[in-house]
Amino acid sequence: MAKKVAIILTNEFEDIELTSPKEAIEEAGHETVVIGDQANSEVVGKHGTKVAVDVSIADAKPEDFDGLLIPGGFSPDHLRGDAEGRYGTFAKYFTKNDVPAFAICHGPQILIDTDDLNGRTLTAVLNVRKDLANAGAQVVDESVVVDKNIVTSRTPDDLDDFNREIVNQLND
């Protein structure tokens, strides 16, 4: 059965960390929905990729989705700057309810705002790892880490492994 995956995103995302997993999800027969600050707007990646925002964070309901993708780049840091903390609250639904959450590179920064990392094993790009550890996570240096429903990965070099695990989780 096809599943629906939310992608939370804003400007300065790492292009390939969005396009590659999104393509893998869609090629596996699942749907993706881009969520951002404003529906029917456009966000631009660090390398110029333009992506339409389908649904605003104000209108998005996490329970409508079967998974969450958080690409890296500077987007996660910008999303964490949301004054109302809506992106962390959105992500918390997934971590607390055992719904798959996929985060790569700087993406796990959003997971810090879920207050649900204590005792979880994660990976991320090097300069995010200390923040994850300070949030209570056990941090390892592996291409992909699966801890229950949370799947994390380090960098674009790990995309093949990350994409494979995303599809495995969605097809379970």
From Swiss-Prot:
User: Which Gene3D superfamilies does the entry link to?
Assistant: 3.40.50.880
Question: Any idea what this protein is called?
Answer: Uncharacterized protein SSP0918
Point out the signal peptide segment: none
Matching Pfam families:
DJ-1_PfpI
Q: Give the family this protein belongs to, as stated in its UniProt record.
A: Belongs to the peptidase C56 family.
InterPro entries membership: C56_PfpI-like, Class_I_gatase-like, DJ-1/PfpI
What S-S linkages are listed for this chain? Answer: none
> Where do the PfpI endopeptidase domain residues begin and end?
3-171
